[in-house]
Amino acid sequence: MSEELGLNDLLAVRREKLQNLEAEGANPFGGKFERTDTAQSMKEKYDAKSKEELEEETHEVVLAGRVMTKRGKGKAGFAHIQDLTGQIQIYVRKDAVGDKSYDLFTSIDIGDIVGVKGVAFKTKVGELSVKVQDFQLLTKSLRPLPDKYHGLKDVEQRYRQRYLDLIVNPEVRDTFVLRSKILQSMRRYLDDRGYLEVETPTMHSIPGGASARPFVTHHNALDMTLYMRIAIELHLKRLIVGGMEKVYEIGRVFRNEGVSTRHNPEFTMIELYEAYADYNDIMELTELLIAHIAKDVLGTTTITYGEHEVNLEPKWRRVHMVEAIKEETGVDFWNEMSDEEARALAKEHNVPVKETMTYGHVVNEFFEHFVEEKLIQPTFVYGHPVAISPLAKKNPDDPRFTDRFELFIVGREHANAFSELNDPIDQRHRFEQQLVEREQGDDEAHMMDEDFVESLEYGMPPTGGLGIGIDRLVMLLTNSPSIRDVLLFPQMRHKDSPATE
């Protein structure tokens, strides 16, 4: 209660200051302010100069930012103002700015946004600063910022009030600046190699391209049920049919699933497709792309994630899913076996399975149970069973498996890719098998998409396709333990609801 009273008192004081400013004819929510410098650009220009060098000639600067600290009494004071690039100290003297501006400076609060004009100089202790000649209040802050040392520590509050998190935690701003640079680097790399960025619908009449529960909505004017897309895949393949031979899309995808450190119901993916390529080509593209991005934005392909040092320099390990399981458990799924025999093996090794699971499902369960989390260095796991890969080509040498790979780094899937299935008869059969699985209770199995099958009947060239989760890639490159750390506004449960996984 006392803390709430204290906050109310602070709010009242700031409201009173606002009223006083307005009574004096000042505008506490000002207009445009022309900056010539930022904290970073000022440091780049003048940090290397000595105190004496800066005094020899005048270096005028104009900056704006949020007041983060303030001190001083009498006729002079210091403050630190913060912009996107960092903080810079300002020095305000009454005899330099005049009585009115100095009174304004003394009245400002931490969190107010100000603009200053002045000259660069260094203090006695060598800190680069601005000797202010003109001081303006640009925005009056009516709420106090969290205390510097005891403030915004609660993780959930940081996610709910990301705007405060960005103000008081510079490393959080750095993460999201880096996220933007990662996307820029990715686009440049693909654009330079002839890929065309496209945009496809986010509302689908039939959800497809992944095994996931969709969000359902309704179009009133058309009186039809629509689904938020669970993948970008099927529309991009239609473009390959149409002759757009190298395409990609970076976009939002929606899956009506649990929230965890690895999952958010709304997330960002890149999907790309290249005609006349296969999954081996896409494997090479994937390692070169990710290594390029790391080198471009971090300056290195050796990164730290948690307790692990990860080497992203190609060429990465490649291992068949069956071989990876055999290495870890000794179980040999190369042997021909029935679905019943596969399920019996699972029970023998305490791998949870359902009675409806086939040989292919069991292989995947073994992999997830015994292998996945142990793949720390970049590893391409290929040869997924047909049963869990309804959109991938069968392997010509062993039709139980597909020409598909997933990329694992630090025990997490980061990419999924195929030699795309372009046989419309086989595709229809795969969809029909998925319908059987839906009838058996798998609500994540694919629906039949007649229009997509029809598009394949016109002929889709051999194609390699790739999907990369942008959020997980950003987590990896920023050493962030939770997906919420790399989403500006992650989905949060209601404050009074129990946590969900």
Swiss-Prot record:
PROSITE patterns: AA_TRNA_LIGASE_II. Mg(2+) 2 binds at residue 413. Its EC number is 6.1.1.6. It catalyses: tRNA(Lys) + L-lysine + ATP = L-lysyl-tRNA(Lys) + AMP + diphosphate. GO terms for cellular component: cytosol. Gene3D superfamilies: Bira Bifunctional Protein, Domain 2, Nucleic acid-binding proteins. Mg(2+) 1 binds at residues 406, 413. InterPro entries: Aa-tRNA-synt_II (IPR004364), aa-tRNA-synth_II (IPR006195), aa-tRNA-synth_II/BPL/LPL (IPR045864), Lys-tRNA-ligase_II (IPR002313), Lys-tRNA-ligase_II_bac/euk (IPR034762), Lys-tRNA-ligase_II_N (IPR044136), Lys-tRNA-synth_II_C (IPR018149), NA-bd_OB-fold (IPR012340). Its cofactor is Mg(2+). Keywords: Aminoacyl-tRNA synthetase, ATP-binding, Cytoplasm, Ligase, Magnesium, Metal-binding, Nucleotide-binding, Protein biosynthesis. Its main location: cytoplasm. It comes from the Bacteria. GO terms for molecular function: ATP binding; catalytic activity, acting on a protein; lysine-tRNA ligase activity; magnesium ion binding; transferase activity; tRNA binding. Binds 3 Mg(2+) ions per subunit. It is an enzyme of class 6 (ligase). It holds the Pfam family tRNA-synt_2. It is found in: Cytoplasm. GO terms for biological process: lysyl-tRNA aminoacylation. HAMAP family: Lys_tRNA_synth_class2 (MF_00252). Belongs to the class-II aminoacyl-tRNA synthetase family. NCBIfam families: lysS_bact, PRK00484.1. Homodimer. This is Lysine--tRNA ligase. The gene is lysS.
